[in-house]
Amino acid sequence: MSSLAEGIGDPQVRNRGTIGGSIANNDPSADYPAACIALNATINTNNNRKINAENFFRGMFETCLKKGELIESIDFEIPQKSDYQKLKNPASRYAVVGVYVANHKSGTIVGVTGAKSCVYNEKSLSDKLSKNFSSNSIDSTEISPSEMNSDIHASAEYRANMVKALAIKAVDAC
């Protein structure tokens, strides 16, 4: 998490922003949401709700928070190994694509940001890495570009390829 935080956007956001603010905003290219997915986070609110990260993020800039509801704390599972890799936009340092791989005792979760309109668990990679935590196990995996973002920074096909490439890099870094 500390190395992820070092690579966040600009100095103002890095030094004054909060993880709670980042996940409540749910910017599709923010870094912390990928960590929340991969680390199987539980988001605790002032209404005493405990929300699993996979249920918290709903869509672009959308979460399941209700009007007036605030994030009070976030609990993370501690993985056996983890790493975050991202392709940075050269101007903003936001993730064009970011991949957080976390290997837990119960299996592996691959959280992806920047690739689609909302952070998500790339289950095809998570399932294969849960069976065999090795970059070789995902080397032949094809990621579909069908729901990927496509803009001036990267095409949908490029983003799909980067999800796999960054996952391989993250696994190798573990």
Model regions and ranges:
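C-terminal structural segment of proteins
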Residues: 1-174
